[in-house]
Amino acid sequence: MFKAQIRPGVELRLLEERHAAAAYALMDGDRDYLRQWLAFVDKTRSEEDWRKFVRASLEQFAATEGFTAGIWEGQQFIGVIGTRKIDWLNGKVELGYWIGRAFQGRGIMTDACRAVVDYAFRELRLHRVEIQCAAGNARSAAIPQRLGFTLEGTRREAELVNGKFYDLLLFSMLKREWPRMNTNEHE
C-alpha cells in the first residue's frame, strides 16, 4: 500500500525519517488545537522526537504490527493516518488519524480512512477495524459515522490528555459490512 492515491492530488505515503521536519512543523503549528485531543502532542517537542516516533513506526511496520502513513496534498504534508495493535489472532486492528486544521472539512480524512479500512479488509484480510476518538471531538467522530461504522459505546475516562481524563467513543466495522458500505459515496 505504501504509496496510495486516495483522490486526485492526495496520497498516503509510509512515514519515513525524512518526513520528520514536515510532520513536526504541521503538528507544532496546530499544537494548541491538537493537544486537546492527542496526548502525544505535549510530549513531542522537536523534530528529533518525531524521528523517534517514525523509527518506532517503521519497526512496527517491519514486525507487521501496524503502519503509519503521512497524508500528502501534492508535496505538502497535511496529516497522519495509521494502524496499530494489529491482533492477527483475532483479525482486528485500531485505526488512528489526525489532519492539520487548515485541511479539515474537505473530506480528505474520510477518503484516507476509507482507503486504509479497505486495505485492512482486502489486503490484510482482517475481520474488524476499530476507531476510537474523544467523545467531545465531533469532527473525528463524524468520520467513522460517515463510513458506516457502528458506535459500540463509550469507554468512560479511558484516555488521559493534558491531565484530564476523556471518554472515548468506540466505533467498529466488520469485514462483511464493508463491501456494502464501500459502494456508496459518504461525503
Regions found by a protein language model. Give the residues of each.
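Short loop/turn motifs at secondary-structure junctions and domain boundaries
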Residues: 59-64, 149
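Generic alpha-helical scaffold signal
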Residues: 17, 28, 44-51, 65
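Residue-level detector of secondary-structure transition/capping positions
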Residues: 28-31, 42, 58
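Conserved GNAT-fold acetyl-CoA-binding loop/helix
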Residues: 35-55
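Short, polar/charged, Gly/Pro-enriched helix-capping and turn/loop motifs at alpha-helix termini
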Residues: 37, 41, 64-68, 127
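Acyl-donor (CoA/ACP) binding surface of acyl/acetyltransferases
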Residues: 1-22, 26-33, 68-182
